[in-house]
């Protein structure tokens, strides 16, 4: 059964209950951590999700997140067209984070890098160096 074959409207409550997720209160919002990696296990990005963005992700098969700075749900790629198609979902042992294996179109980082984790930190100085190339 594929992600788009799920009747989200009818089954969302049951799905979330069965997943035994623990949304944490952050800035008066019930959120959990969402980590996106590609099929090669490269970390692409991390963001927050609320229940509605999780529901939209499961319903559409495309990643939706909750922006704490903009206080709204956004679909990855809604402006850049660099969408993330959900392939698999894993939860962590505490149930307060989800790991999504995604098919990334284009780059994941809004700065034009494949990963948001492109700043390597020198543990002796705390200075960071950009690794990798910007993608056009």
Curated annotation (Swiss-Prot):
InterPro entries: PRA-CH, PRib_AMP_CycHydrolase_dom, PRib_AMP_CycHydrolase_sf. GO terms for cellular component: cytoplasm. The gene is hisI. Its EC number is 3.5.4.19. Binds 1 Mg(2+) ion per subunit. Binds 1 zinc ion per subunit. May play a cocatalytic role and/or a structural role. It is found in: Cytoplasm. Optimum pH is 7.5. Catalyzes the hydrolysis of the adenine ring of phosphoribosyl-AMP. It catalyses: 1-(5-phospho-beta-D-ribosyl)-5'-AMP + H2O = 1-(5-phospho-beta-D-ribosyl)-5-[(5-phospho-beta-D-ribosylamino)methylideneamino]imidazole-4-carboxamide. GO terms for biological process: L-histidine biosynthetic process. Pathway: Amino-acid biosynthesis; L-histidine biosynthesis; L-histidine from 5-phospho-alpha-D-ribose 1-diphosphate: step 3/9. Homodimer. Reversibly inhibited by EDTA and free zinc ions. Enzyme is inactivated by dialysis against 1,10-phenanthroline, which is a zinc specific chelator. Transmembrane segments: none annotated. It comes from Methanococcus vannielii. SUPFAM superfamilies: HisI-like (SSF141734). Zn(2+) binds at residues 93, 109, 116. Its cofactor is Mg(2+); Zn(2+). Gene3D superfamilies: Phosphoribosyl-AMP cyclohydrolase (3.10.20.810). Belongs to the PRA-CH family. This is Phosphoribosyl-AMP cyclohydrolase. GO terms for molecular function: magnesium ion binding; phosphoribosyl-AMP cyclohydrolase activity; zinc ion binding. Mg(2+) binds at residues 92, 94, 96. Keywords: Amino-acid biosynthesis, Cytoplasm, Histidine biosynthesis, Hydrolase, Magnesium, Metal-binding, Zinc.
